[in-house]
């Protein structure tokens, strides 16, 4: 299985999957390709043994937003009506879920819609977790070839990468503030992977986190999954 197949397969396998009738809590993960990473993370951490997961995919070009009028955010060359929070099957799945986890490669243009989107989700009376965006800079295979492995965890980012990473940091802070105002838990995905930092090298604990700077390898998914598992354990123990 290549890196792209790894990212997408599990998400496709559980897309709008019906929940089993058992004592497990039912969790619906909604989002773009970052939701594929989140699905992989929870499975790598074995969270599926205690929770029943289902998924729904909305392309980043359409915006992962529960808002009817967001044409200014959508790619006009893409049929975003096919991927919408207003899909009847999705609404039914939300109603059958105990929790809804929403994640995206969030853009600055998403921020102005976020309050309305969260309002519409909360009307459905479900526990919501909002996950932030993440990025690890440009992945350049030549850099890894030309540098000793001992230096891989001290990767130096280009100016272009730093601009992108600081923009992601700014977006996550804005989402944190909005989430807090609605008493919704915000999960900073970047911090979970980067040990609380706003950005970190794409090499950790002996392997690569991301094959393209955006999406997680199995190693990266395991790191995120264990961090989420620990986070949920801490919440349950309070």
Region spans (language model):
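Extracellular/periplasmic envelope-modification machinery, especially enzymes
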Residues: 1-238
């Amino acid at each position: 299985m290549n890196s792209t197949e790894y990212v997408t397969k599990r998400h496709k396998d559980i897309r709008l999957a019906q929940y089993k009738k058992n004592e497990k809590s039912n969790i619906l993960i909604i989002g773009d390709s970052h939701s594929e990473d989140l699905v992989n993370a929870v499975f790598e951490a074995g969270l599926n043994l205690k929770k029943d997961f289902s998924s729904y995919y909305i392309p980043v070009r359409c915006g992962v937003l529960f808002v009817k009028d967001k044409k200014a955010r959508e790619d006009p060359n893409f049929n975003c009506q096919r991927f919408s929070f207003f899909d009847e099957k999705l609404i039914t799945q939300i109603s059958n879920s105990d929790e809804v986890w929403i994640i995206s490669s969030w853009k600055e243009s998403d921020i102005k819609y976020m309050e309305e989107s969260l309002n519409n989700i909360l009307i459905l009376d479900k526990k919501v977790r909002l996950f932030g965006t993440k990025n690890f800079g440009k992945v350049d295979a030549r850099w890894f070839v030309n540098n000793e492995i001992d230096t891989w965890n001290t990767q130096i980012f280009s100016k272009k990468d730093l601009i992108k990473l600081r923009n992601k940091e700014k977006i996550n802070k804005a989402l944190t503030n909005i989430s807090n105002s609605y008493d919704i838990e915000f999960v900073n995905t970047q911090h979970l992977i980067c040990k609380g930092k706003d950005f970190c090298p794409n090499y950790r604990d002996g392997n690569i986190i991301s094959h393209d700077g955006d999406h997680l390898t199995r190693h990266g998914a395991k790191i995120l999954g264990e961090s989420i598992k620990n986070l949920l354990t801490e919440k349950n123990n309070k």
